[in-house]
Curated annotation (Swiss-Prot):
The gene is rnpA. Its EC number is 3.1.26.5. Keywords: Endonuclease, Hydrolase, Nuclease, RNA-binding, tRNA processing. GO terms for molecular function: 3'-tRNA processing endoribonuclease activity; ribonuclease P activity; tRNA binding. InterPro entries: Ribosomal_Su5_D2-typ_SF, Ribsml_uS5_D2-typ_fold_subgr, RNase_P, RNase_P_CS. Belongs to the RnpA family. This is Ribonuclease P protein component. The keyword Transcription regulation does not apply. It comes from the Bacteria. Consists of a catalytic RNA component (M1 or rnpB) and a protein subunit. HAMAP family: RNase_P.
Amino acid sequence: MFAFKKAQRLLKKNDFDFVFESAKKITTDDFIFLFRENKLGYARLGLALSKKMIAKAHDRNRIKRLLRESFRHTNLPAVDIIILARPGLAKKTNLGINTKLNKTWEKLASCYGK
């Protein structure tokens, strides 16, 4: 069974603060990706999808599932990543979101030469 392992998640405030204090940024129409290299040897993901940006819980949950699954299938360098949602994301289709994510993962990987 495939899973998004606990080790691949940013869970604690210190983990999020580590990224926020000196993050690099990639901005798209739908997302803001904040990322910072870590010393763990694998990538970790944190999600910050607020009610203000995505009002309905089922939309937030759908988008979180898409983000986690896309992250899980992507081979990334050792970075901690926080994804912030932008307004209007809930109106996008799953295919549109996945297409945008794949382009962004490639851009992020190219920042670290992987």
